[in-house]
A protein has these predicted regions:
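Short coil/turn segments that connect the beta-strands within blades of beta-propeller domains
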Residues: 12, 60-62, 111-112, 158-159, ...
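Non-catalytic accessory segments flanking enzyme active sites
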Residues: 51-107, 152-153, 164, 170-176, ...
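Polar, glycine-rich mid-to-C-terminal structural blocks
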Residues: 25-69
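Short, conserved, GDST-rich strand-edge loop motifs in beta-rich repeat architectures
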Residues: 16-22, 26
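Blade-edge beta-strand/turn elements of extracellular beta-propeller
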Residues: 31, 35-47, 82-94, 135-144, ...
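Hydrophobic, well-ordered secondary-structure elements that form the walls
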Residues: 127, 161, 221
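Single conserved hydrophobic/aromatic residue that forms the stacking wall/gate
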Residues: 1-6, 11
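Extended hydrophobic/aromatic segments used for targeting, binding, or gating
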Residues: 87-146
Length: 263
């Protein structure tokens, strides 16, 4: 048996990764159902032992994304799932030491676009979009690098995208409008909290599932109604012992360090 890593991804046939002697995922294979394993096709191999290999499917189900990365460097490739799976993967951005990036696929005005979150000359990360047909072409800046606003993640859906970021210690979620590049924060009642996008596998859904917690609110799952912008409580961790959040308060005090930094 081959040394398998992770789970198989069923896309017309089956894709899987195998590992080397150091248990490093290094090779992506295509298995056609009903054929011998000996006939499996090697789609990609990463020889550099500093890099691990992974693969996934965009939420749109349009592209296979092959991701190669180390702790500080990324390189990603695309395979069009509507075409030949054995065609040479299309490189997005060639690897450069110290540059990390991740991508999402969206369709904007009928055009396939890649939204790329990266730290190329952007310590707190920047969000750009490029044509999927020419990822190394002109970059359209969606969210410019802004010191103090750390972009954490982006998820693309059919009609909008989510942007997760941290500012002044709070992790927040905003909704990105493809047409205007405007980001509108999802508003919560508490002044201090941590919020993030939860599992949302569907390309098009009327609801967005969110994870939420604070110093006084236990782990909570909300669904945001995208039409009304109303939050609906779906699940919350029970706290034993007669806990009442109204018996507690939370606040944040700032101090100024000797170099002028607020902490």
């Amino acid at each position: 048996l081959r040394s398998l890593v992770g789970s198989e991804m069923c896309i017309r046939d089956s894709l899987y990764t195998t590992r080397d002697d150091a248990w490093r995922p290094d090779t992506l294979w295509l298995h056609r159902l009903g054929t011998p394993v000996a006939d499996d096709v090697k789609l990609f191999h990463e020889p550099d032992e500093k890099y691990w290999l992974g693969a996934g499917i965009t939420r749109s189900r349009r592209y296979l994304v092959i991701a190669v990365g180390s702790s500080i460097t990324s390189e990603e490739y695309l395979v069009d799932l509507e075409g030949d799976l054995t065609a040479a993967p299309q490189i997005v951005w060639p690897r450069r030491e110290g540059v990390e990036y991740s991508l999402e696929h969206a369709v904007v005005d009928g055009e396939d676009r890649l939204y790329i979150l990266h730290n190329d000359d952007a310590l707190d990360f920047e969000l750009v979009s490029v044509p999927a047909s020419d990822p190394q072409g002109d970059r359209h800046v969606v969210l410019a690098h802004e010191p103090g606003r750390r972009l954490l993640g982006m998820d693309a859906f059919r009609d909008f995208a989510t942007v997760e970021y941290r500012r002044e210690g709070l992790e927040r979620v905003g909704l990105l409008d493809y047409a205007t590049d405007a980001v509108n924060d999802i508003v919560f009642d508490e002044p201090l909290y941590s919020a993030g996008v939860s599992g949302n596998p569907e390309w098009h859904s009327p609801f967005l599932r969110l994870g939420y917690t604070s110093f006084v609110t236990p782990g909570t799952v909300y669904e945001l109604d995208l039409a009304t912008r109303e939050l609906h409580l779906r699940k919350q961790v029970a706290v034993l012992g007669g806990y009442d959040p109204l018996d507690y308060g939370q606040k944040r005090d700032w101090a100024t360090a000797s170099d002028g930094t607020r902490v």
